[in-house]
Protein backbone atom coordinates (compact mmCIF):
# COMPACT_ATOMS: atom_id res chain seq x y z
CA UNK A 1 0.00 0.00 0.00
CA UNK A 2 2.78 2.42 0.94
CA UNK A 3 4.54 1.63 -2.33
CA UNK A 4 1.42 2.34 -4.37
CA UNK A 5 0.79 5.61 -2.53
CA UNK A 6 4.38 6.77 -2.86
CA UNK A 7 4.66 6.15 -6.60
CA UNK A 8 6.32 2.71 -6.48
CA UNK A 9 5.81 -0.31 -8.73
CA UNK A 10 2.26 0.64 -9.77
CA UNK A 11 3.40 3.93 -11.31
CA UNK A 12 6.40 2.20 -12.87
CA UNK A 13 4.08 -0.34 -14.55
CA UNK A 14 1.88 2.41 -15.94
CA UNK A 15 4.93 4.27 -17.21
CA UNK A 16 6.26 1.15 -18.90
CA UNK A 17 2.86 0.54 -20.55
CA UNK A 18 2.74 4.12 -21.84
CA UNK A 19 6.30 3.91 -23.14
CA UNK A 20 5.53 0.61 -24.86
CA UNK A 21 2.47 2.12 -26.54
CA UNK A 22 4.55 5.07 -27.72
CA UNK A 23 7.20 2.75 -29.17
CA UNK A 24 4.52 0.82 -31.09
CA UNK A 25 3.04 4.06 -32.40
CA UNK A 26 6.46 5.30 -33.46
CA UNK A 27 7.19 1.99 -35.20
CA UNK A 28 3.94 2.19 -37.13
CA UNK A 29 4.53 5.82 -38.11
CA UNK A 30 8.07 5.10 -39.27
CA UNK A 31 7.25 1.94 -41.24
CA UNK A 32 7.19 1.84 -44.99
CA UNK A 33 3.85 2.04 -46.82
CA UNK A 34 2.65 -1.19 -48.38
CA UNK A 35 3.70 -1.38 -51.98
CA UNK A 36 0.91 -1.16 -54.54
CA UNK A 37 -1.44 0.74 -52.21
CA UNK A 38 -2.22 4.43 -52.28
CA UNK A 39 -1.29 6.35 -49.15
CA UNK A 40 -4.95 7.03 -48.43
CA UNK A 41 -8.39 6.48 -49.94
CA UNK A 42 -9.80 9.14 -52.29
CA UNK A 43 -12.68 9.37 -49.81
CA UNK A 44 -10.53 9.57 -46.68
CA UNK A 45 -12.44 12.65 -45.50
CA UNK A 46 -15.52 10.53 -44.82
CA UNK A 47 -15.86 8.50 -41.62
CA UNK A 48 -14.90 5.28 -43.39
CA UNK A 49 -15.73 1.75 -42.27
CA UNK A 50 -17.89 2.76 -39.32
CA UNK A 51 -21.48 1.90 -40.30
CA UNK A 52 -23.14 -1.45 -39.68
CA UNK A 53 -25.93 -3.16 -41.63
CA UNK A 54 -28.66 -1.29 -39.75
CA UNK A 55 -27.53 2.08 -41.09
CA UNK A 56 -27.51 0.81 -44.68
CA UNK A 57 -30.97 -0.74 -44.27
CA UNK A 58 -32.26 2.53 -42.82
CA UNK A 59 -30.87 4.46 -45.80
CA UNK A 60 -32.40 2.17 -48.43
CA UNK A 61 -35.75 1.76 -46.67
CA UNK A 62 -35.93 5.48 -46.04
CA UNK A 63 -35.39 6.23 -49.72
CA UNK A 64 -38.20 3.92 -50.78
CA UNK A 65 -40.50 5.03 -47.94
CA UNK A 66 -42.59 1.84 -48.19
CA UNK A 67 -45.31 3.19 -45.92
CA UNK A 68 -45.82 6.34 -47.97
CA UNK A 69 -45.44 4.51 -51.29
CA UNK A 70 -47.94 1.84 -50.28
CA UNK A 71 -50.54 4.47 -49.43
CA UNK A 72 -50.16 6.56 -52.58
CA UNK A 73 -48.96 4.26 -55.39
CA UNK A 74 -51.77 1.65 -55.62
CA UNK A 75 -54.54 4.20 -56.06
CA UNK A 76 -52.64 5.81 -58.93
CA UNK A 77 -52.23 2.43 -60.62
CA UNK A 78 -55.92 1.63 -60.09
CA UNK A 79 -57.10 4.97 -61.46
CA UNK A 80 -54.88 4.65 -64.54
CA UNK A 81 -57.30 2.05 -65.94
CA UNK A 82 -55.48 -0.83 -64.26
CA UNK A 83 -58.43 -1.60 -62.03
CA UNK A 84 -57.93 -4.88 -60.22
CA UNK A 85 -54.97 -5.41 -62.52
CA UNK A 86 -53.06 -3.08 -60.19
CA UNK A 87 -52.19 -6.15 -58.12
CA UNK A 88 -50.51 -7.72 -61.14
CA UNK A 89 -48.85 -4.35 -61.77
CA UNK A 90 -47.34 -4.35 -58.28
CA UNK A 91 -46.04 -7.91 -58.66
CA UNK A 92 -44.47 -7.22 -62.07
CA UNK A 93 -42.92 -3.99 -60.76
CA UNK A 94 -41.30 -6.02 -57.99
CA UNK A 95 -39.76 -8.33 -60.60
CA UNK A 96 -38.42 -5.32 -62.51
CA UNK A 97 -36.91 -3.93 -59.30
CA UNK A 98 -35.18 -7.25 -58.64
CA UNK A 99 -33.73 -7.29 -62.17
CA UNK A 100 -32.33 -3.81 -61.60
CA UNK A 101 -31.01 -4.91 -58.20
CA UNK A 102 -29.16 -7.78 -59.88
CA UNK A 103 -27.49 -5.34 -62.29
CA UNK A 104 -26.52 -2.99 -59.47
CA UNK A 105 -25.11 -5.84 -57.39
CA UNK A 106 -22.68 -6.61 -60.20
CA UNK A 107 -20.89 -3.52 -58.91
CA UNK A 108 -21.70 -3.50 -55.17
CA UNK A 109 -19.97 -6.88 -54.77
CA UNK A 110 -16.78 -5.45 -56.24
CA UNK A 111 -16.52 -1.76 -55.33
CA UNK A 112 -17.78 0.91 -52.94
CA UNK A 113 -18.35 4.53 -53.92
CA UNK A 114 -20.44 7.42 -52.56
CA UNK A 115 -21.42 8.18 -56.16
CA UNK A 116 -23.23 4.80 -56.31
CA UNK A 117 -24.86 4.38 -59.75
CA UNK A 118 -22.83 7.25 -61.21
CA UNK A 119 -19.54 5.65 -60.23
CA UNK A 120 -20.78 2.19 -61.20
CA UNK A 121 -21.86 3.29 -64.67
CA UNK A 122 -18.38 4.71 -65.27
CA UNK A 123 -16.95 1.18 -65.05
CA UNK A 124 -18.98 -0.01 -68.04
CA UNK A 125 -19.81 3.13 -70.02
CA UNK A 126 -17.66 5.94 -71.34
CA UNK A 127 -17.25 9.08 -69.19
CA UNK A 128 -20.04 10.87 -71.06
CA UNK A 129 -22.52 8.08 -70.36
CA UNK A 130 -21.48 7.99 -66.72
CA UNK A 131 -21.86 11.75 -66.33
CA UNK A 132 -25.34 11.68 -67.86
CA UNK A 133 -26.23 8.79 -65.55
CA UNK A 134 -25.00 10.83 -62.58
CA UNK A 135 -26.93 13.90 -63.71
CA UNK A 136 -30.13 11.86 -64.02
CA UNK A 137 -29.49 10.38 -60.58
CA UNK A 138 -29.04 13.86 -59.10
CA UNK A 139 -32.38 14.81 -60.60
CA UNK A 140 -33.93 11.68 -59.16
CA UNK A 141 -32.67 12.38 -55.65
CA UNK A 142 -33.67 16.05 -55.81
CA UNK A 143 -37.13 15.41 -57.27
CA UNK A 144 -38.05 12.78 -54.69
CA UNK A 145 -36.66 14.97 -51.88
CA UNK A 146 -38.86 17.89 -52.98
CA UNK A 147 -41.91 15.64 -53.21
CA UNK A 148 -41.25 14.19 -49.76
CA UNK A 149 -40.81 17.60 -48.16
CA UNK A 150 -44.06 18.88 -49.67
CA UNK A 151 -45.98 15.68 -48.90
CA UNK A 152 -44.73 15.46 -45.31
CA UNK A 153 -45.74 19.07 -44.68
CA UNK A 154 -49.14 18.36 -46.24
CA UNK A 155 -49.84 15.20 -44.23
CA UNK A 156 -48.63 16.62 -40.92
CA UNK A 157 -50.42 19.89 -41.68
CA UNK A 158 -53.62 17.93 -42.28
CA UNK A 159 -53.33 16.32 -38.86
CA UNK A 160 -52.71 19.71 -37.23
CA UNK A 161 -55.62 21.29 -39.09
CA UNK A 162 -58.07 18.48 -38.25
CA UNK A 163 -57.05 18.73 -34.61
CA UNK A 164 -57.88 22.46 -34.56
CA UNK A 165 -61.33 23.79 -33.56
CA UNK A 166 -62.21 24.69 -37.18
CA UNK A 167 -61.16 21.30 -38.58
CA UNK A 168 -60.37 22.82 -41.97
CA UNK A 169 -57.53 21.82 -44.29
CA UNK A 170 -54.01 23.22 -43.87
CA UNK A 171 -53.41 26.66 -45.37
CA UNK A 172 -50.40 27.73 -47.40
CA UNK A 173 -48.79 29.48 -44.44
CA UNK A 174 -49.00 26.35 -42.29
CA UNK A 175 -47.63 24.13 -45.07
CA UNK A 176 -44.71 26.50 -45.72
CA UNK A 177 -43.93 26.68 -42.01
CA UNK A 178 -44.03 22.90 -41.61
CA UNK A 179 -41.92 22.43 -44.74
CA UNK A 180 -39.28 24.73 -43.26
CA UNK A 181 -39.40 22.82 -39.96
CA UNK A 182 -39.03 19.46 -41.73
CA UNK A 183 -36.15 20.87 -43.79
CA UNK A 184 -34.41 21.99 -40.60
CA UNK A 185 -34.81 18.50 -39.13
CA UNK A 186 -33.41 16.99 -42.34
CA UNK A 187 -30.44 19.37 -42.23
CA UNK A 188 -29.60 18.52 -38.61
CA UNK A 189 -29.85 14.76 -39.13
CA UNK A 190 -27.91 14.65 -42.41
CA UNK A 191 -25.25 16.96 -40.95
CA UNK A 192 -24.76 14.70 -37.93
CA UNK A 193 -24.44 11.67 -40.18
CA UNK A 194 -26.02 8.26 -40.47
CA UNK A 195 -23.83 6.72 -37.77
CA UNK A 196 -25.66 8.62 -35.02
CA UNK A 197 -29.16 8.82 -36.52
CA UNK A 198 -29.78 5.57 -38.38
CA UNK A 199 -31.67 3.97 -35.50
CA UNK A 200 -34.11 6.90 -35.41
CA UNK A 201 -34.57 6.79 -39.18
CA UNK A 202 -35.13 3.03 -39.20
CA UNK A 203 -37.46 3.22 -36.21
CA UNK A 204 -39.64 5.85 -37.87
CA UNK A 205 -39.90 3.78 -41.04
CA UNK A 206 -40.63 0.53 -39.20
CA UNK A 207 -43.39 2.14 -37.12
CA UNK A 208 -44.86 3.71 -40.27
CA UNK A 209 -44.82 0.37 -42.09
CA UNK A 210 -46.50 -1.34 -39.14
CA UNK A 211 -49.25 1.30 -39.23
CA UNK A 212 -49.84 0.84 -42.97
CA UNK A 213 -49.79 -2.97 -42.71
CA UNK A 214 -52.24 -2.82 -39.80
CA UNK A 215 -54.53 -0.48 -41.75
CA UNK A 216 -54.40 -2.77 -44.79
CA UNK A 217 -55.24 -5.82 -42.68
CA UNK A 218 -58.07 -3.87 -41.04
CA UNK A 219 -59.52 -3.08 -44.47
CA UNK A 220 -59.35 -6.74 -45.47
CA UNK A 221 -60.73 -8.03 -42.15
CA UNK A 222 -63.65 -5.65 -41.59
CA UNK A 223 -67.06 -7.35 -42.01
CA UNK A 224 -68.47 -7.06 -45.52
CA UNK A 225 -67.81 -8.17 -49.07
CA UNK A 226 -64.19 -9.02 -49.86
CA UNK A 227 -62.12 -10.51 -52.68
CA UNK A 228 -59.40 -13.02 -51.91
CA UNK A 229 -55.87 -12.55 -53.22
CA UNK A 230 -56.42 -15.28 -55.81
CA UNK A 231 -59.76 -13.81 -56.90
CA UNK A 232 -58.15 -10.42 -57.52
CA UNK A 233 -55.35 -11.98 -59.56
CA UNK A 234 -57.67 -14.08 -61.70
CA UNK A 235 -60.08 -11.19 -62.23
CA UNK A 236 -57.35 -8.79 -63.27
CA UNK A 237 -56.80 -9.25 -67.02
CA UNK A 238 -60.41 -8.86 -68.25
CA UNK A 239 -62.61 -5.84 -67.58
CA UNK A 240 -63.99 -5.77 -64.03
CA UNK A 241 -65.87 -3.51 -61.63
CA UNK A 242 -62.91 -1.13 -61.45
CA UNK A 243 -62.65 -0.84 -65.21
CA UNK A 244 -59.47 -2.79 -65.91
CA UNK A 245 -58.24 -2.18 -69.46
CA UNK A 246 -56.49 -5.55 -69.72
CA UNK A 247 -52.80 -5.85 -70.46
CA UNK A 248 -52.41 -2.20 -71.46
CA UNK A 249 -53.90 -1.11 -68.15
CA UNK A 250 -51.70 -3.54 -66.25
CA UNK A 251 -48.60 -2.19 -68.01
CA UNK A 252 -49.61 1.38 -67.17
CA UNK A 253 -49.88 0.27 -63.57
CA UNK A 254 -46.43 -1.34 -63.69
CA UNK A 255 -44.93 2.02 -64.63
CA UNK A 256 -46.64 3.67 -61.67
CA UNK A 257 -45.82 0.88 -59.21
CA UNK A 258 -42.17 0.93 -60.26
CA UNK A 259 -42.05 4.48 -58.91
CA UNK A 260 -42.73 2.95 -55.49
CA UNK A 261 -39.35 1.19 -55.61
CA UNK A 262 -37.05 4.00 -56.73
CA UNK A 263 -34.24 4.65 -54.29
CA UNK A 264 -33.92 1.08 -53.01
CA UNK A 265 -30.23 1.09 -54.01
CA UNK A 266 -29.34 4.31 -52.18
CA UNK A 267 -27.64 2.38 -49.39
CA UNK A 268 -24.80 1.90 -51.88
CA UNK A 269 -24.00 5.60 -51.44
CA UNK A 270 -22.78 4.70 -47.93
CA UNK A 271 -20.37 2.05 -49.25
CA UNK A 272 -17.09 3.70 -48.16
CA UNK A 273 -18.57 4.39 -44.72
CA UNK A 274 -19.80 0.81 -44.21
CA UNK A 275 -18.00 -2.05 -42.52
CA UNK A 276 -17.73 -5.04 -44.89
CA UNK A 277 -19.46 -3.16 -47.74
CA UNK A 278 -19.05 -6.00 -50.25
CA UNK A 279 -21.18 -8.21 -48.01
CA UNK A 280 -23.64 -5.73 -46.50
CA UNK A 281 -24.53 -3.55 -49.51
CA UNK A 282 -25.47 -6.40 -51.92
CA UNK A 283 -27.71 -8.00 -49.31
CA UNK A 284 -29.51 -4.73 -48.61
CA UNK A 285 -29.91 -3.96 -52.32
CA UNK A 286 -31.38 -7.43 -52.88
CA UNK A 287 -33.71 -7.67 -49.87
CA UNK A 288 -34.96 -4.09 -49.55
CA UNK A 289 -37.19 -4.24 -52.67
CA UNK A 290 -38.49 -7.64 -51.56
CA UNK A 291 -39.54 -6.33 -48.14
CA UNK A 292 -40.94 -3.10 -49.55
CA UNK A 293 -42.65 -5.01 -52.35
CA UNK A 294 -44.44 -7.24 -49.85
CA UNK A 295 -45.92 -4.17 -48.15
CA UNK A 296 -46.86 -2.64 -51.51
CA UNK A 297 -48.59 -5.84 -52.70
CA UNK A 298 -50.57 -6.11 -49.44
CA UNK A 299 -51.64 -2.46 -49.62
CA UNK A 300 -52.59 -2.83 -53.29
CA UNK A 301 -54.74 -5.87 -52.50
CA UNK A 302 -56.43 -3.97 -49.66
CA UNK A 303 -57.12 -0.94 -51.84
CA UNK A 304 -58.38 -2.96 -54.82
CA UNK A 305 -60.70 -4.85 -52.48
CA UNK A 306 -61.79 -1.64 -50.75
CA UNK A 307 -62.50 0.36 -53.89
CA UNK A 308 -64.45 -2.56 -55.38
CA UNK A 309 -66.63 -2.97 -52.28
CA UNK A 310 -67.18 0.61 -51.12
CA UNK A 311 -67.67 2.53 -54.35
CA UNK A 312 -65.08 5.17 -53.40
CA UNK A 313 -63.79 6.69 -56.65
CA UNK A 314 -60.02 6.06 -56.94
CA UNK A 315 -59.69 8.85 -59.50
CA UNK A 316 -60.99 11.47 -57.06
CA UNK A 317 -59.66 10.52 -53.63
CA UNK A 318 -56.59 12.39 -52.40
CA UNK A 319 -56.09 10.25 -49.27
CA UNK A 320 -57.12 6.75 -50.35
CA UNK A 321 -56.43 4.79 -47.18
CA UNK A 322 -58.23 7.38 -45.07
CA UNK A 323 -61.27 7.45 -47.38
CA UNK A 324 -61.47 3.65 -47.58
CA UNK A 325 -61.21 3.29 -43.81
CA UNK A 326 -63.93 5.91 -43.41
CA UNK A 327 -66.16 4.12 -45.92
CA UNK A 328 -65.67 0.92 -43.92
CA UNK A 329 -66.58 2.71 -40.69
CA UNK A 330 -63.02 2.83 -39.32
CA UNK A 331 -62.02 6.38 -40.24
CA UNK A 332 -62.25 7.99 -36.80
CA UNK A 333 -59.91 5.46 -35.20
CA UNK A 334 -57.33 5.39 -37.99
CA UNK A 335 -57.32 8.88 -39.50
CA UNK A 336 -54.78 10.75 -37.39
CA UNK A 337 -52.40 7.83 -36.57
CA UNK A 338 -52.22 6.76 -40.22
CA UNK A 339 -51.65 10.28 -41.54
CA UNK A 340 -48.94 10.85 -38.94
CA UNK A 341 -47.29 7.57 -39.93
CA UNK A 342 -47.35 8.45 -43.62
CA UNK A 343 -46.12 11.99 -42.91
CA UNK A 344 -43.21 10.64 -40.85
CA UNK A 345 -42.43 8.14 -43.62
CA UNK A 346 -42.14 11.04 -46.05
CA UNK A 347 -39.79 12.81 -43.61
CA UNK A 348 -37.59 9.70 -43.46
CA UNK A 349 -37.63 9.55 -47.26
CA UNK A 350 -36.54 13.19 -47.46
CA UNK A 351 -33.65 12.49 -45.06
CA UNK A 352 -32.50 9.46 -47.05
CA UNK A 353 -32.86 11.23 -50.42
CA UNK A 354 -30.86 14.24 -49.26
CA UNK A 355 -28.21 11.93 -47.75
CA UNK A 356 -27.76 10.20 -51.10
CA UNK A 357 -27.83 13.52 -52.98
CA UNK A 358 -25.10 14.91 -50.74
CA UNK A 359 -22.90 11.82 -51.18
CA UNK A 360 -23.22 12.08 -54.97
CA UNK A 361 -22.23 15.76 -54.95
CA UNK A 362 -19.33 14.83 -52.65
CA UNK A 363 -18.14 12.16 -55.11
CA UNK A 364 -18.30 14.57 -58.04
CA UNK A 365 -16.47 17.21 -56.02
CA UNK A 366 -13.76 14.72 -55.07
CA UNK A 367 -13.23 13.90 -58.75
CA UNK A 368 -13.16 17.60 -59.64
CA UNK A 369 -15.91 17.41 -62.26
CA UNK A 370 -17.73 20.04 -60.18
CA UNK A 371 -16.27 22.44 -57.63
CA UNK A 372 -13.98 20.67 -55.18
CA UNK A 373 -15.59 22.57 -52.32
CA UNK A 374 -18.28 19.89 -52.39
CA UNK A 375 -15.66 17.43 -51.13
CA UNK A 376 -15.19 19.35 -47.86
CA UNK A 377 -16.57 17.71 -44.73
CA UNK A 378 -17.54 18.70 -41.21
CA UNK A 379 -14.54 18.44 -38.87
CA UNK A 380 -16.46 16.59 -36.17
CA UNK A 381 -19.11 14.58 -38.00
CA UNK A 382 -17.12 14.06 -41.22
CA UNK A 383 -20.18 14.63 -43.39
CA UNK A 384 -20.12 16.69 -46.64
CA UNK A 385 -21.45 19.95 -45.23
CA UNK A 386 -20.83 22.14 -48.29
CA UNK A 387 -22.66 19.68 -50.53
CA UNK A 388 -25.43 19.53 -47.91
CA UNK A 389 -25.85 23.30 -47.90
CA UNK A 390 -26.07 23.47 -51.69
CA UNK A 391 -28.31 20.44 -52.15
CA UNK A 392 -30.72 21.28 -49.33
CA UNK A 393 -31.04 24.89 -50.48
CA UNK A 394 -32.17 23.63 -53.89
CA UNK A 395 -34.77 21.16 -52.66
CA UNK A 396 -36.19 23.55 -50.03
CA UNK A 397 -36.24 26.94 -51.72
CA UNK A 398 -37.87 25.70 -54.94
CA UNK A 399 -41.06 24.31 -53.33
CA UNK A 400 -41.33 27.18 -50.84
CA UNK A 401 -41.10 29.72 -53.66
CA UNK A 402 -43.69 27.80 -55.67
CA UNK A 403 -46.09 27.65 -52.71
CA UNK A 404 -45.73 31.35 -52.00
CA UNK A 405 -46.40 32.10 -55.68
CA UNK A 406 -49.71 30.27 -55.41
CA UNK A 407 -48.82 26.99 -57.12
CA UNK A 408 -51.08 24.24 -55.71
CA UNK A 409 -49.39 21.81 -53.37
CA UNK A 410 -50.56 18.80 -55.37
CA UNK A 411 -49.13 20.22 -58.60
CA UNK A 412 -45.72 20.74 -56.98
CA UNK A 413 -45.72 17.17 -55.69
CA UNK A 414 -46.79 15.74 -59.07
CA UNK A 415 -44.09 17.61 -60.99
CA UNK A 416 -41.47 16.69 -58.38
CA UNK A 417 -42.32 12.99 -58.31
CA UNK A 418 -42.57 12.85 -62.11
CA UNK A 419 -39.16 14.46 -62.43
CA UNK A 420 -37.64 12.27 -59.74
CA UNK A 421 -38.98 9.00 -61.13
CA UNK A 422 -37.80 9.86 -64.65
CA UNK A 423 -34.35 10.72 -63.31
CA UNK A 424 -34.13 7.44 -61.39
CA UNK A 425 -35.30 5.38 -64.37
CA UNK A 426 -32.73 6.95 -66.70
CA UNK A 427 -30.01 6.25 -64.12
CA UNK A 428 -31.20 2.64 -63.80
CA UNK A 429 -30.98 2.29 -67.57
CA UNK A 430 -27.39 3.53 -67.44
CA UNK A 431 -26.27 1.07 -64.76
CA UNK A 432 -28.17 -1.84 -66.38
CA UNK A 433 -26.40 -1.20 -69.69
CA UNK A 434 -23.04 -0.79 -67.93
CA UNK A 435 -23.24 -4.05 -65.95
CA UNK A 436 -22.66 -6.60 -68.76
CA UNK A 437 -20.06 -4.37 -70.41
CA UNK A 438 -18.17 -4.20 -67.13
CA UNK A 439 -18.38 -7.96 -66.59
CA UNK A 440 -17.12 -8.60 -70.11
CA UNK A 441 -14.23 -6.22 -69.53
CA UNK A 442 -13.09 -8.10 -66.43
CA UNK A 443 -13.76 -11.52 -67.99
CA UNK A 444 -16.65 -12.53 -65.69
CA UNK A 445 -19.66 -12.21 -68.00
CA UNK A 446 -22.14 -15.09 -67.73
CA UNK A 447 -25.32 -15.86 -69.62
CA UNK A 448 -27.48 -15.34 -66.52
CA UNK A 449 -26.01 -11.95 -65.61
CA UNK A 450 -26.18 -10.77 -69.22
CA UNK A 451 -29.82 -11.87 -69.55
CA UNK A 452 -30.84 -10.13 -66.31
CA UNK A 453 -29.11 -6.87 -67.25
CA UNK A 454 -30.47 -6.87 -70.81
CA UNK A 455 -34.00 -7.61 -69.57
CA UNK A 456 -33.77 -4.82 -67.00
CA UNK A 457 -32.42 -2.32 -69.53
CA UNK A 458 -35.01 -3.22 -72.18
CA UNK A 459 -37.92 -3.03 -69.76
CA UNK A 460 -36.67 0.24 -68.29
CA UNK A 461 -36.24 1.87 -71.71
CA UNK A 462 -39.80 0.84 -72.57
CA UNK A 463 -41.06 2.21 -69.26
CA UNK A 464 -39.20 5.51 -69.61
CA UNK A 465 -40.76 5.99 -73.03
CA UNK A 466 -44.21 5.09 -71.75
CA UNK A 467 -43.80 7.20 -68.60
CA UNK A 468 -42.89 10.24 -70.69
CA UNK A 469 -46.03 9.66 -72.73
CA UNK A 470 -48.12 9.32 -69.57
CA UNK A 471 -46.72 12.54 -68.13
CA UNK A 472 -47.45 14.43 -71.34
CA UNK A 473 -50.97 13.04 -71.67
CA UNK A 474 -51.66 13.89 -68.02
CA UNK A 475 -50.62 17.50 -68.61
CA UNK A 476 -47.43 17.12 -66.60
CA UNK A 477 -45.10 18.06 -69.42
CA UNK A 478 -43.04 20.19 -67.05
CA UNK A 479 -41.44 17.07 -65.54
CA UNK A 480 -40.36 15.91 -69.00
CA UNK A 481 -39.03 19.37 -69.85
CA UNK A 482 -37.01 19.47 -66.62
CA UNK A 483 -35.47 16.08 -67.39
CA UNK A 484 -34.65 17.08 -70.97
CA UNK A 485 -33.25 20.42 -69.82
CA UNK A 486 -31.04 18.93 -67.11
CA UNK A 487 -29.63 16.24 -69.40
CA UNK A 488 -29.02 18.80 -72.17
CA UNK A 489 -27.19 21.12 -69.80
CA UNK A 490 -25.21 18.15 -68.47
CA UNK A 491 -24.17 17.22 -72.01
CA UNK A 492 -23.04 20.79 -72.76
CA UNK A 493 -21.18 21.05 -69.45
CA UNK A 494 -19.47 17.72 -70.04
CA UNK A 495 -18.30 18.73 -73.52
CA UNK A 496 -16.78 21.92 -72.10
CA UNK A 497 -15.19 19.96 -69.26
CA UNK A 498 -13.69 17.45 -71.67
CA UNK A 499 -12.28 20.24 -73.81
CA UNK A 500 -10.79 22.37 -71.03
CA UNK A 501 -10.25 19.90 -68.15
CA UNK A 502 -9.60 16.48 -69.75
CA UNK A 503 -7.82 15.11 -66.66
CA UNK A 504 -10.93 15.69 -64.58
CA UNK A 505 -13.00 13.75 -67.09
CA UNK A 506 -10.57 10.85 -66.74
CA UNK A 507 -11.16 10.87 -62.97
CA UNK A 508 -14.87 10.05 -63.34
CA UNK A 509 -15.74 6.79 -61.62
CA UNK A 510 -13.34 6.93 -58.67
CA UNK A 511 -14.22 4.35 -56.03
CA UNK A 512 -13.02 3.53 -52.54
CA UNK A 513 -9.97 1.29 -52.20
CA UNK A 514 -7.83 -0.15 -49.45
CA UNK A 515 -4.98 2.24 -48.72
CA UNK A 516 -1.75 2.02 -46.78
CA UNK A 517 -3.49 3.85 -43.94
CA UNK A 518 -5.91 0.92 -43.63
CA UNK A 519 -3.25 -1.64 -42.72
CA UNK A 520 -0.90 -1.95 -39.76
CA UNK A 521 2.26 -1.22 -41.75
CA UNK A 522 0.98 2.12 -43.02
CA UNK A 523 1.70 5.61 -41.84
CA UNK A 524 -1.45 7.04 -40.29
CA UNK A 525 -2.52 10.60 -40.78
CA UNK A 526 -0.77 13.08 -38.56
CA UNK A 527 -2.65 13.95 -35.37
CA UNK A 528 -4.77 17.05 -35.77
CA UNK A 529 -4.59 16.99 -39.57
CA UNK A 530 -7.40 18.90 -41.24
CA UNK A 531 -10.20 16.85 -42.72
CA UNK A 532 -11.33 19.61 -44.97
Language-model features, listed with the residues they occupy:
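TM-loop-TM module centered on a large, flexible mid-protein loop between adjacent transmembrane helices
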Residues: 119-122, 126, 161-162, 287-353, ...
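Membrane-interface loop-to-helix entry segments
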Residues: 174-225, 284-292, 423-426, 441-457, ...
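Transmembrane helix-loop boundary segments of multi-pass membrane transporters
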Residues: 76-81, 85-87, 161-172, 195-204, ...
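Membrane-helix boundary/coupling elements in multi-pass transport proteins
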Residues: 136-151, 266-273, 332-372
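A generic transmembrane alpha-helix motif of multi-pass inner-membrane proteins
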Residues: 73, 221, 424-427, 445-532
Amino acid sequence: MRQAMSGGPTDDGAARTTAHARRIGAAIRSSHPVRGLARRSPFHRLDRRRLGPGAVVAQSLGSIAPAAASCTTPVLAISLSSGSGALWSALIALVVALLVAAAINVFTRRMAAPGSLYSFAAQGLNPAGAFLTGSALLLGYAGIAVMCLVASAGYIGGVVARSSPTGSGPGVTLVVFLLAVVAAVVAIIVRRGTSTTWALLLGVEVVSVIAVVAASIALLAVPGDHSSFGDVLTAAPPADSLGSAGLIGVFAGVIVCTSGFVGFESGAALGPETRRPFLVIPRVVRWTPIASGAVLVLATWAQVDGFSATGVDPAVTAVPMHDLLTARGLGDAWSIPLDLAVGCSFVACAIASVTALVRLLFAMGTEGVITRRFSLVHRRFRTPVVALSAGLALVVLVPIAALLLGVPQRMIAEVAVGTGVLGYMVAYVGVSVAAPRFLRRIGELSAASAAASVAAAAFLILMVTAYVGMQLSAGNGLAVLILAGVLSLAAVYFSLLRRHRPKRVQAIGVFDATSSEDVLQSAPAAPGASRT
